[in-house]
Amino acid sequence: MSASHNLSLFFESLDLSKERLELLLEAFYPMLKAAFCISLPLAIISFILGLFIAVFVALIKIAPPKHFVHKALLAGVNFYVSLIRGTPLLVQIVVVFYGLPALGVYMDPIPAGIIAFSFNVGAYASETLRASFLSVPKDQWDSSLSLGLNYLQTFWHVIFFQALKVATPSLSNTFISLFKETSLASVVTIAEVFRIAQQKANASYDFLPIYLEAALIYWLFCLVLEAVQKRVEKILN
């Protein structure tokens, strides 16, 4: 089959008849609603929880090992980061939702998705935060400790917000990627944008236009998120 014939078939599949336009309009609102009510909140909640995990992991990694407990924690967080970064997010979601019930742990799709996304974000963001914490000059740590502040007080009052400014661009990109990756939650029946698109496409057998419509919604949201990212970076700078 020639390339020109394939191209012709592609444009024929995009033929916007009245019936197809009605179908696209009918599918657009549920997908847009899912983006606002499911995908975006899922990304926000998972990102916030993931940041808490990331801060904890980064602190363990940058703290000087002084005793057995810290060394054990360091080994644990290194294993966690390696495991999460070395396995696909889709597999992690499936393991949490379908695998944990084998151990007697049952949960609804949305909590399962939040847990999987949060731990994924935590592993990746921890490396970003660790690098940003280490970017703060060491003499600021030493000066604060010499003034009587303990390790956590020094971190919170002196280091954290300086490091956050450095980490903001990378963390913003992580959040935008996370929003797109919420489409993977469709495998555990969470009714986010892509799940709605699948349902509409399966019902109408008109796959390409509806999937392109879903892609358009993701793209528009990402454009808005990128604009917010640039605004935040401008304020911080």
Language model features: what each stretch is:
Residues 1-237:
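Transmembrane alpha-helices and adjacent helix-loop boundaries
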